[in-house]
Amino acid sequence: MGCSSSALNKAGDSSRFGSGVTSNENSSTVEHNKFCVDQPKPCTPGGEAAFHGNTQRESHPSLERPKASVVPTANGVKSYHQPSLANDETPGKEATDHSRPTKKIEPLVQGGECEQPQPGGKDDMLGTEEVKKDVEARTEVPSLKGDAEIKPLRLSSERDSPGAPQAGTMKFLQTAENILPLETTQELPPKEATGKGAQPQILEAIPKENSSPEIEGIQSAESSGQQQLVEAPGEAEQPQALETVLKENETSQMPGRSQPVPTPVMNKSPCEAPDGLRNAHEPQVTGGNRVQPAETGETAAKVEMAREIHPDKEEQHIEGETGEKVEAEMKNEKESEEAETKEKETGEAVDLGAAGAGDRRA
């Protein structure tokens, strides 16, 4: 420690007597020697002279270097004049300042490592480079963290298969916040659209179902009407039949006609029916409604039954049309009754024909 402080003091004295450039160069060489001491040497007077001689020897080649008062640095331009003035003014402070870093650097020197610092510009460059490296290292660390966080996503997307449930669950959990709203927005409108589209269909189906009884009633009414029309003649034939019947009735009621008028085809029978019976069996027209004539077979049977039950009326109607009034059957019935009573009383048969002839003569 004592050697280094004395050497520095001597170097400061030499720098005072030299020029500004030489003092700067000597200070730089002193700094070189300060950092480049390989091993601590014992404090001997001969060693101090040798150390001082070495400093002078090293200072002479420095004179041969080109003189430059300005050195470029990373942050700007730096001159050597200011440090020389500072060194001239405070030599004691420099000695004390140089002694302090020697204490801190001694462990490095003992380790056998000799780091020769370069001039101020290069030191600044190294400092900036180290800062850049630190910044890059710090930026690389989060980037590595980001890659580590992103890799599971890539692996999950690449390994996403039915056989890898963990990757699928990781992907689902990581993308649930983004995917769920999209799925809801994409799926809900179709559902709402289908619901709205289905409601009119349901409403249309409900009125159809509600109206089905009415339709069935209408169909049943139509079917019953069709059955009646099937049993009766066709609709197109009905107006024609009605027209023919009305025409025949009009012709039969016309004056000057004493002969009976033939009935229409539907009411035709082996015997010509009188006008009254014919009108009774003819269909009657009611206001605006369709007239459905009775069945032909039923009408014929009814006419025959009426003739069998009321033969006298038929004959009377026929005789009325011809203008003759004869009550033959009434007389025949009376004669038959009288003959029966006589047979019971006398036991003799009476000729009905003779009795009838006598009655007619009388």
Curated annotation (Swiss-Prot):
Residues 55-67, 90-106, 121-139, 146-161, 304-347 have a biased composition (Basic and acidic residues). Keywords: Phosphoprotein. It comes from the Eukaryota. The modification Phosphoserine is found at residue 161. Residues 110-120 have a biased composition (Low complexity). Residues 16-30, 220-229 have a biased composition (Polar residues). Disulfide bonds: none annotated. Residues 1-169, 183-362 are annotated as: Disordered. InterPro entries: Glu-rich_5. This is Glutamate-rich protein 5. It comes from Mus musculus.
